[in-house]
Amino acid sequence: MKNLFKGLMMSLSMFTIIPMPYVEWDEDGAKNMMKCYPIIGLIVGCVWFLGYKLINYLNISIVLKSALIMIIPFIITGMLHLDGFMDVCDAILSRRDKEEKLRILKDSTTGAFSVISVIILFFIQFGAVHSFLEYNKNPYILMFLPIISRNIVAYFFITIITIKESTLGSYFTKGTNIKDKVILILELALVCILFGSILGYIGIAILLIVAVAISLCVKKCFKEFGGISGDVAGFSLVVGEIVGLFSACLFT
């Protein structure tokens, strides 16, 4: 239990901007971080949901409301996953060989492809949030999407082989086993039940769409890079969430 709590504290300090007391990082805590990843999603989702509610009450234009609501998940996570999204887009869209793509993936320089990709992402996310406000969509979707995406990404992260250059990815997955996978599956099943109870079959359909989107991202990255990494996880998470948000606009 102590190591699980340490894993949660490490996850909060790593994946959010929430100030946390100092915890010494070690492998015992690191191997529990992925089990806690859905909890990070719950925190992000709750902040997004509450932000949506509060901003929606402001006497400002729907355009400004949409912009403010759109950036909430990026702000609370310190742009961490957005950085991974940009790095992976830069590498894949370069159309180079595998070794060069891996070099681009690790390169801290911001390329043109990453900038173009994030602009497209922002346009789609802005439009989706605008639709949420305009058509009064169920805001609980904003609470559940970060949980669903992180749960699925965490499962793949401890299941798929990590890129050998990804030392951080290996650090998080070292010591994980079948028990961790079972816990993540049970967590996802619980989320599925709760999400389905709110949105019915539509909720289950959105969850499956997100799962397929993330699976395709992981499969593509495995083909391009030979494994998974923190950047790949961030890329898959961002794509999964925007696909889920877009699907919610279409089907709810």
UniProtKB/Swiss-Prot annotation:
InterPro entries: CobS
Domain of life where this protein originates: Bacteria
GO molecular function: adenosylcobinamide-GDP ribazoletransferase activity; cobalamin 5'-phosphate synthase activity
Location(s) in or outside the cell: Cell membrane
One of the Pfam families matching this protein, by short name: CobS
Zinc keyword on record: no
Known pathway: Cofactor biosynthesis; adenosylcobalamin biosynthesis; adenosylcobalamin from cob(II)yrinate a,c-diamide: step 7/7
EC number(s) given by UniProt: 2.7.8.26
Entry membrane topology: Multi-pass membrane protein
GO CC field: plasma membrane
Name assigned to this protein: Adenosylcobinamide-GDP ribazoletransferase
Source organism of this protein record: Clostridium botulinum (strain Alaska E43 / Type E3)
Phylogenetic lineage: Bacteria, Bacillati, Bacillota, Clostridia, Eubacteriales
